[in-house]
């Protein structure tokens, strides 16, 4: 069992290698490393930039980039290390609650949808 996240996890996402697990709850994202013997006894990475509950998490198909969306419409792209620690490499804003996020297969574009039915795409610098 893992513990240490600040609030009840509301969303979960593994990266494509299965070595990182991101959990979203409240405004903070917690990232656990499954390298070596797994996350028990390790200190997870904590990512903070949202001012509202995190509503969506999605890892890029390639590499260790994570996209997150929140109820206030904020979106962040995170660059992560293999231990789950990292930082924001870009942010954007939608007009309403982020309800979905998806990466293009080449990991260079993300699309996000919101509660008003709008869909927006962004190119992600590599």
Describe the residue ranges of each PLM region.
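WD40-repeat beta-propeller superdomains and closely related acidic/aromatic-rich repeat-like regions
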Residues: 1-126
């Amino acid at each position: 069992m893992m513990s240490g996240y600040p609030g009840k996890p509301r969303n979960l996402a593994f990266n494509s290698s299965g070595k990182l697990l991101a959990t979203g709850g409240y405004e903070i994202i917690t990232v656990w490393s499954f390298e070596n013997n797994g996350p028990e006894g390790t200190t997870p990475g904590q990512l903070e930039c949202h001012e509202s509950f995190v509503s969506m998490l999605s890892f890029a198909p390639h590499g260790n980039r994570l996209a997150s969306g929140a109820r206030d419409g904020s979106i962040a792209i995170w660059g992560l290390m293999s231990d789950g620690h990292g930082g924001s490499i870009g942010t954007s804003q939608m007009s309403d609650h982020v309800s979905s996020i998806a990466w293009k297969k080449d990991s260079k574009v993300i699309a996000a949808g919101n509660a008003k039915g709008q869909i927006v795409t962004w190119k992600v610098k590599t």
